[in-house]
Each structure stands twice: as structure tokens, then as C-alpha cells.
Amino acid sequence: MTVNTTDRLAALRSLMKERSVDIYVVPSEDSHASEYITDCDARRTFISGFSGSAGTAVVTLDKAALATDGRYFNQASKQLDENWHLLKTGLQDVPTWQEWTADESAGGKTVGIDPTLISPAVAEKLNGDIKKHGGSGLKAVTENLVDLVWGESRPPRPSEPVFLLGAKYAGKGAAEKLTDLRKELEKKKAAAFVVSMLDEIAWLFNLRGNDITYNPVFFSYAIVTKDSATLYVDESKLTDEVKQYLAENGTEIKPYTDLFKDTEVLANAAKSTSESEKPTKYLVSNKASWALKLALGGEKHVDEVRSPIGDAKAIKNETELEGMRKCHIRDGAALIKYFAWLEDQLVNKKAKLNEVEAADQLEKFRSEQSDFVGLSFDTISSTGPNGAIIHYKPERGACSVIDPNAIYLCDSGAQFYDGTTDVTRTLHFGQPTAAEKKSYTLVLKGNIALDTAVFPKGTSGFALDALARQFLWKYGLDYRHGTGHGVGSFLNVHEGPIGIGTRKAYIDVPLAPGNVLSIEPGYYEDGNYGIRIENLAIVREVKTEHQFGDKPYLGFEHITMVPYCRKLIDESLLTQEEKDWLNKSNEEIRKNMAGYFDGDQLTTDWLLRETSPF
């Protein structure tokens, strides 16, 4: 649905003129660099009408541009009104939003941004680019201008309860995690680490919340020094159990709004050191805000680092890994029941079900499983051409009826107390064409190739990406998204710093035993269909005949327990090794589903058919 943004842009431009700003940048993120945000922080969506999770809006006094990546080209072209120009990031000869902004700044123009919504590295590079192109520079505008346009209709900030995640699920206490973090401070000779990422704070203190839909996090900051820890959070959200737990771990509670006041105290303390002493250094994540770096005293006193908390969080302990395995079995049972039910509804009962009605039923089946908390993201329930919109979101009351004679793509996930799931399966309830079967099988071959890969410790996801694409590449085909992302343990479904893809950030982060990430190659034909096959996998050490360079070798243990669509597989394109892999995988699924469908003949028959040997 397209939103008319004419009045909103006019109001924003009026505020820009009042503040001597010629160009205003509106990022997607909140002040914690969250990928998924709460409604009151959806500023880019409000000003542009584009609701995808990634993108940046740039507004001049007479133009407006929205930059997003290949996952959202289709969606953005449908949602943006005539006021906006779409910058298709990654395509040849298309400028990035930074390049477009710098070009527009020529002639001494000032570019403004809310400094809490941009990292120091991006801000500093943008400032340099603006000046190179003849602009006056990047200005920190402390009042968010979109918030002022939004006014009283802006949703309130959530204040959901915060609860303790016990050792049964976390596997490691907050006191031990704080000790490990302090060792990192000592190594880096830093006085404190100011924590701004919400999932890092939740993990560090073994707490969870519900301030951002689908993400069990809560609005907070933290400061950890060698002998103290302070959690900045609205205290009314904390139960007595949480307060006691924090006290036992030596953590002081302060209001969320006190963070910047206390960073000024730290900055003043750092400035008071004598010239003969080494300057006091504070650590922040390389995803922390420009505002936070400025508040701590700027370049002299702040080191931006890949967060040691993020690195530790990405390597799950044995309790977390076992939880991930178990919740994927329960999640698999819900999905298998759903796909059997959906086929029966569409084929046997000739029911007319729309995409949202189907997704609601999947959520119902998931909610029947133990330790279920909620979904981990909006279910992508997509029929036919909607599947080609990579992050499609069916709208209640305005979505398509599922066509049994078209490809159906379902990308969904859940939050359980013992883990987070994310799985995509592509199905056909009628008779697929030879071209559809070929496309599906090429994607499946890529999934198998990556799942069975063995690689030396120290290998990054950047280096592995081509394994999943190679079969598509042989036919001149590809997909415009990463092949894999890290996944949290009852935390965010997208978790850094690891991933599989061509992002430069992945080059410097090797995969390590205990990582959990997705393997999800795909193929999309605009206006026709989308195919994606996604499993979650644990990185683990594997035994090899040799260990060149005395390095251990790693591989994947896939934990998703859902079969692949039998009728979409072209067996003639599979090698015997790939058939053996499928047979082993299907046998494992059957074994893990024992007892889940007793008395449910419909689901049992579907499972036996879809997992029959090749």
C-alpha cells in the first residue's frame, strides 16, 4: 500500500530550513542500532512509506531518495509514492545513499542527522565525502526532526516487563559473563565498556523483555568497569526477582535516561588525567552511536571495537546448543503438521485460504509446543509472485488467496525459552513445471553443498558463500541476499557478527565451533515465484584424516527438522551423494518426530510420503 508523503515531507522541509539544514538523513535503525525496531522508532517508514527492515531515506529541500538492497527492490517500488526516487543499492551505476547525499551537498550545503542513529565510522566517512564534494559537512541535529513532524500521533515507547532467563536455559551466569568481559577490558587497557546493543545487554545479564516485537529485548544501556556494573533501565519494568538477581551480581540499577549524564561524568574524568599519563580509554561497540562517542569525549578517549560481548554471545555454550536442538524438533513438528494441514485444506477440501489465515494456523500449531513464547519475525506466507518479494509481509485483509497450482514459500520462526528458530520451505500443491523443479533443485543442491562443507578453522562465511550459489551460477542465475546469518539463543533471529555472504564485515569474522547460523540459498523470478530453502546449523569440529597446518577442521550440524518438497525435486539433477544426504536427513527427521503425531493419520501420512527414500 502506498502512503501519500507530500504533507510529511513539506513539514520536514520547513523544520530543516528553520535549523539551516539543506539535506536530512533518516536511517532505519534506532539509537541502539537495532535491525528490528519498535513502532515509535520507525521514522524512515513514517517519512517514506517504505516498511522494509533495511534502507535509508535522504530528503533535500526539493528531492527525496530511498536506498535499499535487493531484498526490497520489489517492495519499495510498490510502496514509495511519486515524491520518492528509489536507489537500488548494489546495482551497477547506482549510487549508495552516502554517494547520493555527498553529490547533493555540492555548493556548501549542510547535511543533518540525529547523531544517535548513525555510527561514528559512518558519520566520519560521510562528513569527509560531503566536504570532498563541496558540502559544508555533517551536522549533529540533536532534536529528531521526523519525531517533530510525527508529533502526538507517534506511538509511545513500550515498557514491557523484564524477566530472568534461568540457568536451565542460559547455561552461564551473569557473574561469570561479567568476569569474562572484565578480562577483555584488561587486555585492551580500557577503563569501561559502554554497552548499547539491546541483545548484548539481555545476554550479558541473562534477562529478557518484549519491547521490540519478536525480539526478547528491552530498552537499556549498561556500563561495565573493572569493579562495577550499571544497568540503565526503567526500574518499573523489573520484578523483585530481577532486582535481587542484579544485586547479587553486583549490578546497580539507574534510570534509562541517566546514561548520557553519566557518560559526561566519564568524559570529564578522562579529560582530568594529566598530560604525562596515558589517556583514559573507553570501549564502545563499532555499532554504537556517534552521539555516544561524542558524549564520552570523542576520538582521544573512545575505541570502537567489534564487541567482545557480541563475539562471546555468538559462540553458544552446551546448554544453549542443546536447547537449540530441542526447540527445532518441536518447531519441526509444528511445521510438518502445518504443511500437512495446508495441503489437505487446499487440495482435498478445496478451501479458499489467504496467506494470513494460513500463517495464523501455523502460529496456532507452534503455540501448542512447550516453552513457546512467540514468533521470531513476521511469517512470510507467500503464494506465486509474492514469493519473489524476498521479505514479503502479507497484510491482513489485503493479501492473496493461496493458489494450489503455484509455488508457496513459507519463511517463519519462533521464540522458545530454550532457543530461536528460523526455517524456510518452498512447496507446490499441484503439478510444478519442469522449470520450477529445476530451479528448486539447484537451490537444494546449494543448500546440501554448504551443509556438507568441511573447512579449516579460521575460515569466514565470506569464503563459503560461493558453495551455495555455484549450481545457480552455472546457469547464469543468482539471488540478491546473503546465504546465512547468525541466530540468537532466545534472542534476535538475526545476530552478528557472523554470517555467510559477500558483506565485507564477514571477511574478518571466522566461523567458530558453537556458532549457530542459517543456510538459505534461494532463487526468485519477479512476477512469477520465489524459492528459498533455509535450515539452521551449528558449527562444530569434524574429524578429518589429516589436519594441514595443525588446524582443526569444521563443518555444520543442521538442526532444522522439516522435509523438503518431494514433488519439486528433479532427481535427474541430483548426484548419488546428494540423494544419500537427503535419505539420511529424512531418516533423522522421522526419528525425531516419533511420538509427535500419534493418532494424527493425516500428518503421519504426509511425513512418510515426503521422507520416503530416494
Swiss-Prot record:
The record's annotation in InterPro entries points to:
Creatin/AminoP/Spt16_N, Creatinase/aminopeptidase-like, Creatinase_N, Pept_M24, Pept_M24B, Peptidase_M24_C, Peptidase_M24B_aminopep-P_CS, X-Pro_aminopeptidase_P
Q: Which reaction does it catalyse?
A: Release of any N-terminal amino acid, including proline, that is linked to proline, even from a dipeptide or tripeptide
Q: Where does Mn(2+) 1 bind?
A: D422, E520, E534
Which cofactor(s) does the record list? Mn(2+)
**CDD domains found in the cross-reference section:** APP
Please provide, alphabetically and separated by semicolons, the GO molecular function terms listed in this UniProt record. Answer: metal ion binding; metalloaminopeptidase activity
Keyword Manganese applies: yes
The source's superkingdom equals Eukaryota
Mind listing the UniProt keywords for this protein, alphabetically?
Aminopeptidase, Hydrolase, Manganese, Metal-binding, Metalloprotease, Protease
Q: Where does Mn(2+) 2 bind?
A: D411, D422, E534
Under which EC number(s) is this enzyme classified? 3.4.11.9
Stored Pfam families: Creatinase_N, Creatinase_N_2, Peptidase_M24, Peptidase_M24_C
Q: Which family does it belong to?
A: Belongs to the peptidase M24B family.
PANTHER family (UniProt xref): XAA-PRO AMINOPEPTIDASE 1
- Its recorded name reads Probable Xaa-Pro aminopeptidase P
Natural source organism: Sordaria macrospora (strain ATCC MYA-333 / DSM 997 / K(L3346) / K-hell)
What lineage is on file?
Eukaryota, Fungi, Dikarya, Ascomycota, Pezizomycotina
